Amino acid sequence: MKISTVFVLAAFNRLHKKMNVLYHDYAKSVGLSDAAFWLLYSLYEYGQPCTQKDLCSAWFYAPQTINSALKSMEEQGLVSLELAPKSRKNKQIFFTEAGKVLIEEKIVPLVNAEELSFERLDEQERSQLLEITQKHIEVLEQEIAKIE
């Protein structure tokens, strides 16, 4: 690996970490754990109804993580779980009124900030960011698969 690649990769990794810290700090500032924050964010983004399986697939969380966060949120009166039609096992997740209020107060403002920040990039920059990030993830997956 070239020295310049090492420095660029280190800078990229710091930026990635900084992005994670931004979300972690925001979640903490509004009184949410990371898992609860991302679960609420996911439910808002995904729309209702959805299942735990949908969330695990969309956000790459372990089922146990989603299950624990959902149980806690159900106990807090933020979500309700109901059996999906024609299912004996899969439950759909619905916001309660308290959950809807929490989403409007804590998640929607962040989503709006994300959208505003993304809109400050021009259309070509947004497209390039997505394309390059996707390509990097695909290549990294391939390289990791070689060492596993």
Regions found by a protein language model. Name each.
Residues 15, 19-22, 102, 106-118, ...:
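Alpha-helical linker/hinge and terminal dimerization helices associated
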Residues 4, 35-36, 51, 98, ...:
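N-terminal positioning helix adjacent to the helix-turn-helix/winged-helix DNA-binding module
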Residues 1, 124-148:
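C-terminal regulatory/oligomerization modules of transcriptional regulators
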Residues 71-131:
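Charged, amphipathic alpha-helical coiled-coil/dimerization segments
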Residues 1-30:
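N-terminal leader segment of winged-helix/HTH proteins
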Residues 25, 68, 72, 135:
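Alpha-helical DNA-recognition elements
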Residues 21-65:
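N-terminal helix-turn-helix DNA-binding core of bacterial DNA-binding proteins
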Residues 13, 41-47, 107, 134:
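Short, locally clustered residues in the helix-turn-helix/winged-helix DNA-binding domain
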